[in-house]
Design a protein with these regions (language model features):
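Nucleotidyltransferase catalytic core that binds NTPs
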Residues: 1-140
Length: 140
């Protein structure tokens, strides 16, 4: 969720309908720096924006440390701590052949995983948006 976009809003609105409380697990700046090499929007700003969406009860950061992305990019530690009834995933996640650690943990803890939450699958991407900005900057 860096930057936030309409796909995230649709995911959140759909996820609200799945339960009584909506907790968003937000990848922290360390995770983003390891994955992309930079942070576009600082975690505090992303958190504040998410908290301003009606129906979001809580936003929690992952506790990834610098360099940890390549060892553990999952949100398993927080799933163990929060113990939600449902783990909702957006339009870019697949139920088939997706050997992510969250699947095994959710099965073990009895957490239901719901895929493709939101309208219309993957309608936007943070990476796509950043690529458009980079392309526009190259042209100017």
């Amino acid at each position: 969720m860096d930057p936030l976009h309409i796909g995230h809003v649709r995911l959140i609105k759909a996820a609200q309908k799945l339960g009584d409380e909506l907790i968003i697990i937000l990848n922290n700046d360390n995770w983003l720096k390891d994955k992309k090499g930079f942070v576009f929007m600082p975690q505090r700003e992303r958190k504040e924006m998410l908290e301003s969406i009606c129906g979001v009860d809580r936003v929690v950061f992952t506790d990834h440390q610098p360099g940890e992305y390549f060892k553990d990019r999952s949100v398993c530690r927080l799933l163990k701590k929060i113990r939600p009834h449902i783990f909702a995933n957006g339009g870019d996640r697949k139920p088939d052949g997706d050997p992510v650690p969250e699947v095994a943990l959710c099965e073990k803890l009895g957490i239901e995983i719901i895929y493709n939450v939101g309208e219309g699958g993957k309608v936007q991407s943070s990476s796509w948006l950043l690529a458009k900005v980079a392309q526009a900057n190259r042209k100017s």
